[in-house]
UniProtKB/Swiss-Prot annotation:
Every Helicase C-terminal domain range: 260-421
Name the record gives this protein: ATP-dependent RNA helicase DDX39A
UniProt motif (DECD box) ranges: 195-198
Post-translational modification: SUMOylated by RANBP2; SUMOylation modification affects its ability to bind RNA.
Entry's family note: Belongs to the DEAD box helicase family. DECD subfamily.
Length: 427
């Protein structure tokens, strides 16, 4: 595993297996072929925010027409430099809020990093950096870099020295390593962003790193934090980083269900899961599918089995070298493979626009993880299907917790499902 060769100071935190809560959705805006597919309740357009013309051009290229509710609530204040604490359900465009707000305010100065965005997994950091590249398409003077463990720190040092970015996205372990070896100066940071902030601040080792990095940035700066799940306990921790923040809780925590997502369970023995999965993959219509399992071993074995059964599957898990993970993520995102088998590593924040079915082959360990996993389907308010295998009493208990917490009824999978309920007919 590539991470293990790397010095201690390149700590990453995405290596827990079961306990990794899936990450909400950091949405990549829809591509042109699914134009305007955000659920939007506002008829105002992005022009009303008085954004730079370069940003508006990029927004049009991405196929956005109207801001989502969270964008409508946050962007006008965020572009004025106000601190923001935001919770909104998966797939509602939170990433675009901080990407647009920081690019609107940025005044690039050679050799100075002014925007720092941190998240808890490498894949999510990679994805956010791609969003910055997408939205800064017509801002050629703005340079964006992404830094995370598992790849050579020497390359990162070289980038900072010879082609210093204005926007840095990364994981706290690698960022702190670069700061400690004096490759990376935080003294010009004007915008400090945490995506999936609950995940970062709940883990004490990661929270310590975030706090150390935060203390090394200037006192006067904008601080923004976002997540799909923000418990009452973690909110005060977030507020300690902020000065009089605007707080936007678009959804009451109990109503974090996803519009357009059909959710079902199947009761079966562990030994019956493979046969049932193959049967369902045969009869269901899908664009792309993600199958979540609880361990690296199961991930590898199931992916192999699917390939042997002529299902074009690819696996992503924490045991892979970083380059391999990113390469596979890109293959799946580019639609080269239609079935992905993954551990929780992939659950939170990853955004693949064509996924319309998620299987919980193994039950997630809690209701947060359930939300973040199933949020991979039905992105941007499109239709989707989530099917959860329940094989013992503990599984049943977690499913009951999900139904109680999110006030949703997860029914037993019927013999037949109307295809129009889980797939966009126009696609």
């Amino acid at each position: 595993m590539a991470e293990q060769d790397v010095e201690n100071d390149l700590l990453d935190y995405d290596e827990e297996e079961e306990p990794q809560a899936p990450q909400e959705s950091t949405p990549a805006p829809p591509k042109k072929d699914i134009k305007g597919s955000y659920v939007s309740i506002h008829s105002s357009g992005f022009r009303d925010f008085l954004l730079k013309p370069e940003l508006l051009r990029a927004i049009v290229d991405c196929g956005f027409e109207h801001p989502s509710e969270v964008q409508h609530e946050c962007i006008p204040q965020a572009i004025l430099g106000m601190d923001v604490l935001c919770q909104a359900k998966s797939g509602m465009g939170k990433t675009a809020v901080f990407v647009l707000a920081t690019l609107q305010q940025i005044e690039p100065v050679n050799g100075q990093v002014t925007v720092l965005v941190m998240c808890h997994t490498r894949e999510l950091a990679f994805q956010i950096s791609k969003e910055y590249e997408r939205f800064s398409k017509y801002m050629p003077s703005v340079k964006v870099s992404v830094f995370f463990g598992g790849l050579s720190i020497k390359k990162d040092e070289e980038v900072l020295k010879k082609n210093c970015p204005h926007v840095v996205v990364g994981t706290p372990g690698r960022i702190l390593a670069l700061v400690r070896n004096r490759s990376f100066s935080l003294k010009n940071v004007k915008h400090f962003v945490l995506d999936e902030c609950d995940k970062m601040l709940e883990q004490l080792d990661m929270r310590r790193d975030v706090q150390e990095i935060f203390r090394l940035t200037p006192h006067e700066k904008q601080c923004m934090m976002f997540s799909a799940t923000l418990s009452k306990d973690i909110r005060p921790v977030c507020r300690k980083f902020m000065q009089d923040p605007m707080e936007v809780f678009v959804d009451d925590e109990t109503k974090l269900t996803l519009h357009g997502l059909q959710q079902y369970y199947v009761k079966l023995k562990d030994s019956e899961k493979n046969r049932k999965l193959f049967d369902l993959l045969d009869v269901l219509e899908f664009n792309q599918v993600i199958i979540f399992v609880k361990s690296v071993q199961r991930c590898m074995a199931l992916a192999q089995l699917l390939v042997e059964q002529n299902f074009p599957a690819i696996a992503i898990h924490r045991g892979m070298a970083q380059e391999e993970r990113l390469s596979r993520y890109q293959q799946f995102k580019d639609f080269q493979r239609r079935i992905l088998v993954a551990t929780n590593l992939f659950g939170r924040g990853m955004d693949i626009e064509r996924v319309n079915i998620v299987f919980n082959y193994d039950m997630p360990e809690d209701s947060d993880t359930y939300l973040h996993r199933v949020a991979r389907a039905g992105r941007f308010g499109t239709k989707g299907l989530a099917i959860t295998f329940v094989s013992d009493e503990n599984d049943a208990k977690i499913l009951n917790d999900v139904q109680d917490r999110f006030e949703v009824n997860v029914a037993e999978l019927p013999e037949e499902i109307d295809i129009s309920t889980y797939i966009e007919q126009s696609r």
